[in-house]
Amino acid sequence: AASGLEAAMKAAGKQYFGTALTVRNDQGEIDIINNKNEIGSITPENAMKWEAIQPNRGQFNWGPADQHAAAATSRGYELRCHTLVWHSQLPSWVANGNWNNQTLQAVMRDHINAVMGRYRGKCTHWDVVNEALNEDGTYRDSVFLRVIGEAYIPIAFRMALAADPTTKLYYNDYNLEYGNAKTEGAKRIARLVKSYGLRIDGIGLQAHMTSESTPTQNTPTPSRAKLASVLQGLADLGVDVAYTELDIRMNTPATQQKLQTNADAYARIVGSCMDVKRCVGITVWGISDKYSWVPGTFPGEGSALLWNDNFQKKPSYTSTLNTINRR
């Protein structure tokens, strides 16, 4: 059996096991990311978002994004680039601009061409459109939807395809894992893009999950069979699927029992990817609980990743590795 997550995924016929990354000087984290048996893909956590790269119109800030791209390419890792068109972390000049259909499309095109052009040939995957759905499966309100209508989604894919035909183009969202109205909305988006005669290569399921009911999520992680059926239903549209931002949070503080329940939830998610041929990879949203976004966003919740604050492997690490090795 393979001794690391990336090695195990490769042995299982998958493409990668990855992590989100914010470059920082912490040797404990760096040592894990340097281990090619453990990690094989990097997603910049924030450095490639619109407000980070183009905070003012025509003013591009490439330093952090370049640094994160180099973190992947220097190690020979895949680079899941994230994200081009999203309502959040969008600079106010875009969100509050006085646009019409034509001028907003020009802004989208300029941004997509600049960003995808700079990293062309480095990004193995791109999250082209992120979080375009409400929980009921309708389209989320955004400047893009208000000005252009639902066509902004296929338009973004068309622009992305023109800017870098070599990368895999994804739609990415959260709460798609439950087989509900939002899942159906993601299927509608895939069909919409294809109806324009365009390519959509994959659907990313963020997989920000819980291992027990919490104040922010009533429904803990579903069964492996349920998760696999959801993945297969998406893959049946002719797209790859991936878990792109996996973390499984709990009400803190953690206990041994909670950590084991959490490990079981990880096994269900990871196992569902093993069960679906077109599930190409898994990315966790960070290495260690020390830097997880969860406690800051969901107070009283946490312990959501595979390594603890001291970079020790948790029960969730063991269950993840064992599940991949068992397939």
Curated annotation (Swiss-Prot):
Disulfide bonds listed in the record: C81-C123, C273-C279
Entry keyword annotation includes Zinc: no
Subcellular location: Secreted, Extracellular space
Pfam family, one: Glyco_hydro_10
Catalytic site: E131 (proton donor), E245 (nucleophile)
Highest taxon, organism lineage: Eukaryota
Carbohydrate-modified residues: N101
Residue ranges of domain GH10 in the record: 1-323
GO molecular function annotation: endo-1,4-beta-xylanase activity
pH dependence: Optimum pH is 6-8.
SUPFAM superfamilies assigned: (Trans)glycosidases
EC number annotated for this UniProt entry: 3.2.1.8
Keywords (A to Z) from UniProt: Carbohydrate metabolism, Disulfide bond, Glycoprotein, Hydrolase, Polysaccharide degradation, Secreted, Xylan degradation
Biological processes per GO annotation: xylan catabolic process
Reactions performed catalytically: Endohydrolysis of (1->4)-beta-D-xylosidic linkages in xylans
Major enzyme class: hydrolase
Temperature optimum or stability note: Optimum temperature is 40-50 degrees Celsius.
Pathway in which this enzyme or protein is active: Glycan degradation; xylan degradation
Cellular component per GO, a single term: extracellular region
Family recorded in the similarity comment: Belongs to the glycosyl hydrolase 10 (cellulase F) family.
Subunit details: Monomer.
Protein name listed in UniProt: Endo-1,4-beta-xylanase A
Species, as recorded: Fusarium oxysporum f. sp. lycopersici (strain 4287 / CBS 123668 / FGSC 9935 / NRRL 34936) (Fusarium vascular wilt of tomato)
